[in-house]
From Swiss-Prot:
Lineage, top ranks: Eukaryota, Viridiplantae, Streptophyta, Embryophyta, Tracheophyta
One Pfam family it belongs to: Beta-prop_KIB1-4
F-box domain span: 6-54
Gene3D superfamilies xrefs: 1.20.1280.50
Name of this protein: Putative F-box protein At5g55150
Coiled coil: none
Length: 360
């Protein structure tokens, strides 16, 4: 016989915490939050204390490809998010405004429209672009948000335009605010351990303070082992909430072919120094130019290989690339790379997102 609904709320919080901590799928934990208020409190606490393996967002996904990924990755597509056929909603934005959504609950938050950017106004006035052009769809290169958009004080930081400048908005803002303290083109941004960071093409790291009255980007430290390195740089979150800088290097081998390799540096907040990470130690690292860059414990997170880097490679449509992207895995110990997936569509976008707030 089914238990009365009231009895579900009478389970001890300690018991609920134990049960929820043993759930490995974020969707299961979020579904538990809908049972009653006590379950919501316990499941929310567990949910935000955990690091979940990311979803793979694919902008153009066929049903056959989705079946292929069913035993490897959790896959998201615009159709699953309710945006299929919506010409005003794109992966990074639209002329009418941005959206932020959770991939499980599909909740949506409105953000300031692209037209509030002066660069967009100039392009439209000069007729250099039209509202539905590919250039406008890819105007925002990357977006990251503070921990939860359920918070009244949430903030969103973006990299925008071809010169890769920074702008941000706070809850209720009608337009984007430029952050003009960064001298060089920005390679990547991240929200890590309660702080926004940016890294420019020269390898300078900035702490981005996005206050309403005095927003600024302050250099994090004067020296770094990757300063002036011309390779692609990512800002990533370690599985214990420390800041990582990941260098993606292309080097010529003995056969005069280019080989991809990675270097990782961890920032010590107490000494303001960088330490080279020599091993992923059972972790899997996920990298993508547009999406989340994060390390998780591979053994607890499904079918991912440990000591491996899962990265999106190839031409990035957001920076004018016209070729296909592909998903590959770099095995840390052997230094071997295996291509996992290449989409059929030449303009397909792929990136990693986590089961928290997803920039759209």
């Amino acid at each position: 016989m089914a238990l009365p609904s009231s009895s579900w709320s009478e389970f001890l919080p300690e018991l609920l915490n134990t049960v929820f901590h043993n759930l490995n799928d974020a969707r299961d934990i979020l579904n538990c939050a809908t049972v009653c208020s006590s379950w919501k409190d316990s499941s929310s606490a567990v949910y935000y204390s955990r690091t979940f393996s990311p979803f793979l967002f694919i902008s153009h996904l066929s049903s056959n490809e989705e079946i292929r990924f069913s035993d490897q990755f959790r896959v998201l597509s615009p159709g699953k998010l309710g945006f299929s056929g919506n010409q005003q909603a794109w992966v990074c934005g639209s002329t009418l405004g941005f959206l932020l959504t959770k991939p499980v609950t599909k909740s949506v938050t409105s953000l300031p429209p692209l037209i509030s950017f002066e660069d967009v106004q100039r392009l439209l006035q000069s007729q250099a672009i039209i509202p539905d052009s590919e250039a406008l769809k890819n105007f925002i290169k990357k977006a990251v948000s503070s921990t939860s958009l359920l918070d009244d004080e949430w903030v969103v930081l973006v990299i925008y335009n071809t010169d890769r400048k920074l702008a941000f908005c706070r809850r209720g803002d009608k337009q984007w605010t430029d952050l003009e303290s960064v001298a060089s083109s920005v390679d990547d941004i991240v929200f890590c351990n309660g702080v926004f960071f940016a890294i420019d093409r020269l390898g300078e790291i900035y702490h981005c303070e996005l206050s309403a009255n005095n927003p600024k980007a302050t250099p994090l430290c004067s020296t770094s082992p990757f300063r002036y390195d011309s390779c692609k740089k990512y800002l990533a979150e370690s599985d214990y909430d420390e800041l990582w800088v990941v260098l993606k290097k292309l080097e010529l081998n003995d056969d005069c072919d280019f080989e991809t390799s990675f270097e990782i540096y961890e920032f010590n907040r107490e000494t303001n120094e960088w330490t080279k990470v020599m091993s992923l130690r059972g972790k899997a690292l996920f990298l993508s130019p547009q999406g989340r860059c994060i390390a998780v414990l591979a053994g607890e997170r499904g079918f991912f290989k440990d000591n491996s880097v899962y990265f999106i490679d190839g031409d990035d449509p957001s920076v004018g690339g016209s070729g296909p992207q592909n998903l590959s895995v770099f095995e840390w110990e052997s230094k071997q790379i295996m291509k996992i997936y290449q989409p059929r569509s030449w303009n397909c976008q792929m990136f990693w997102v986590t089961p928290t707030d997803v920039p759209q």
